[in-house]
Every structure is written in structure tokens, then in C-alpha cells.
Amino acid sequence: MGETIIEKIIRHNTGKAVKPGDIVTVNVDRCMIHDIFIPFVADKFEEMGFTKLHDPDKVVLIYDHLVPASQQDDTRHFHKGDEFVEKYGLTHVHRSAGICHQLMTEAGYVKPGDIAFGTDSHTTTYGCVGAFSSGIGYTEMASILGTGTMWIKVPETIKVVIDGELPENVMSKDIILRLIGDLRADGATYRALEFSGSTIENMSVASRMTMANMAIEAGAKCALFTPDEKTAEYCEIELNDYQKSLVGDEDAVYMKTMTYKAENFVPVMACPSQVDKIRNVSELEGTEIDQVFIGSCTNGRLEDLRAAAEVLKGKKVADFVKLIVTPASRKIYRQALADGTLDILAEAGAIITHPGCGLCCGRTGGILSDGERVVATNNRNFLGRMGTSKVEIYLASPRTAAACAVAGKIVNPE
């Protein structure tokens, strides 16, 4: 019988063939902790009685949610993290380089076929390069730090096939939002999403990253893309035989298969305050807005900033609308600075901020008040995420968000 991608990864890791529902213990190739959770992980690690890390080289600590500190208590997280680094000999530490999920692939920490866990729900992002990655809590992370292993239940797989050429103003964000709307917020709970088709093959790794990042919004345990030459170039590696084998077999057993024609996708938005509340942008046109946010681990990459700049070039952000742009990493910031992208955005009236999570998690500037509306490119629009519980958050692609910033209201990108 054939295997899905997730089944191949687990078999390679454990040396045993598996099927959905099996409980197995895997060897963890890489784990990530960010600044929000490091105090809790550190305390739980010592509470469990561990005195040393199983393998310090497999641990990555990234400060991103709270950088730079906007509240007095934020510095406690940094101090706790630095103490942990010094005490246990961590060498992979990033204090201001960008968002954790961007850095994990950008810096080469996760490779195709790896198994990785992180203390953040959007750890599913690394599936963009063909890795099995998922978010966990601080207790599980503390256990991994001490043992190097983690138990998992082998998930069923939902196959998503997308063929054809996308319309000009449609981005991968529109695809994943539509998929979440079709599946609903719990439609893929503890299941793997496996993406294939000509549309996926033609996508950049950055676009795949957007889709893998948001898989959790349908409840998915992970999202997986077959590694290809684009993956190899991005990861700066030559794919080995194992990595080349990470494609779903024709006779693999899937929970179900969802098929789409790329030409049928249109710009969409997730409406307040549910990520699966999806409507076409055309249905929302004319809705006035107060702010636009372009950034996050979902859409803060160079191609996202360039897409926004293409829309904004020669135009101005509407009066009384604030446009905040936050690159996902320092590397992306410098690339966008070097190629003139940031200059176009700044000339249009954008506020360019330091790399990091920024407004996505409601920190370090840009929060809104009662009755205000924001169009944002991040991954969640829950109540209170960007200010008070009476703020309305609409999730969209960078092209759509940029068009809305110019119009001062929700419009289709042109």
C-alpha cells in the first residue's frame, strides 16, 4: 500500500511503517522556543528534574513577539531566556533578527523531511519545505529538551489538488483563506494537509509558506508540500533520495481529496472575528477602514512587500488611514531596502517598522480602539487581538491590503 508524505516522514524517522491512528515516538530534529514561552519552558524543564539539554544544537531560541519591549514585564522574558542560554549552552539564539517561523527556514534550521516542533501554533509553516512541523505547549517542549523525543498520533491526510493558473490579483493567501472557509475552523483537526497540483508546483516557497502557516486555522496538525528544485534552492541544499521521495503515492489512502481550478479563485477576506468566515472582496467593497497592516509570519516576506509596492507605486495612502508595514526578518528588511521596495512603500505613506511579530500579536505599536477597522495580512482576526474587543479585523492578501490602504475602504486589488 502506498504512503502519504506524513507517513513517509514518520517511517523514515522511526524505521517503522505507520498508519493513521498509530501512536509513535519520534526523534525530534529541531525545536523552537520564542520569547513568550521561554520562562515557562525553562521552569518546567527544571521542575521535571532535567539538568542538561539532550542536544543543545537542536534547540533554537528566538525573541520576536516582544521585541523591542513595549511593557515593563516583557524584559523578564528576555532575562529568563538569557539565563537559560548561559546555563545550558544554547548556541542558536536570535534576539532581534525577525519572526521565529521565518527564521527557522530562512536560516536553514529546518530541512525537507525533518520533524520539528515549536511553542507556537503556526509552527505548521515549515511544511512549506516538506518538513513535518507542529505547535506544542511548554510542557511537551520541556520534555523534548530533556529527552530529544516526542510522541505523536499519526494523522489522517486530506489531499488538496490545485491545477491551473491563478488570476493576476489572486495570491496564495486567497487560496488558503478559501480552503479554510470550505473546511471550516475544525474541518482538518489533527489531520495533515497535503498540497499538490500544477498551481502548487509553480508557486514560490514564500507563497507555499503562507499556506502552510495558516493550515492550523482549519485545525490541521501539519501541512506538507513536496520538496522540489525551488525548495532546494531556498534551503541551499541538494535534495537527497529520501527528500526526493516525499510525494504522496498514487495508491496512498487519504481521508478525502479536495480539488480546485486555479482560475476560479478570486480575492477574498476573512471577516470579523472568525478566520473561516470567508467572503469575496467584491461583496465587502465600500466598507470604510482605519488602518492596514502588511506583515507577519504569514505575509511579511519580500514577495509580499513587493506585491504591496506594486499596488502602491505612485499612489498615496488615503487620508486618516495608517499603513503599517513590518518585514518578517532583518534579511527581508535589507533586501526590500536594497531593491527600493521600502522606498516605494514609504513614499506612499507607509510606516515601516522593525522586523518582528508586531501588530499581529497586538504588541509594539499600532493597536486600535473601539469601532475601528483594520485590513491585515496576518493569520488571525480573533476578538481583542489588535486592540479592544470592539475592533474589526479583516484578513486579506498583501495586494488586497495595499489597494484598501489607497482607497481608505475595502476594494478589489487592481
What would you call each of these model-derived segments?
Residues 1-414:
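Fe-S-dependent hydro-lyases/dehydratases of central metabolism
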